[in-house]
Amino acid sequence: MEILNQFSQFSPNMEAQGASSIPQPSQDAHEKARQQAENQETAKNGMISQILDQAAMQRLSNLAVAKPEKAQMVEAALINMARRGQLSGKMTDDGLKALMERVSAQTQKATSVKFDRRRNELDSDEELDL
């Protein structure tokens, strides 16, 4: 019975409406999510500006332009260090360099080149009948 009641609520020209009758996520929800992300970004930037001195902020900005993923990792490490109380005062440029080197060492991928020489197939002695 409940299903029949739901169908009776639909208008007879429902088929003509097509996709417009499908409930869409409200624009308010998208706006709210965007606003929340913007607030989190602002809070993160505020924390980082309190953690780093001017030279270190400039270096982090340069890193964010060149390698955004690595900059996000460094920012996360800085915020975690600040929350744990591992930082005393503002971090200098040298301290940021050391942190960047540690993050790079942890995330560095080992690249290797492997040559697969097929000696049996490319043996030139067989071709020359020596």
Curated annotation (Swiss-Prot):
Keywords: Coiled coil. One of its GO terms (cellular component) is nucleus. Residues 1-46, 103-130 are annotated as: Disordered. Residues 27-51 form a coiled coil. SUPFAM superfamilies: Double-stranded DNA-binding domain. Residues 1-27, 36-46 have a biased composition (Polar residues). The keyword Coiled coil applies. GO terms for molecular function: DNA binding. This is Uncharacterized protein D2005.3. It comes from Caenorhabditis elegans.
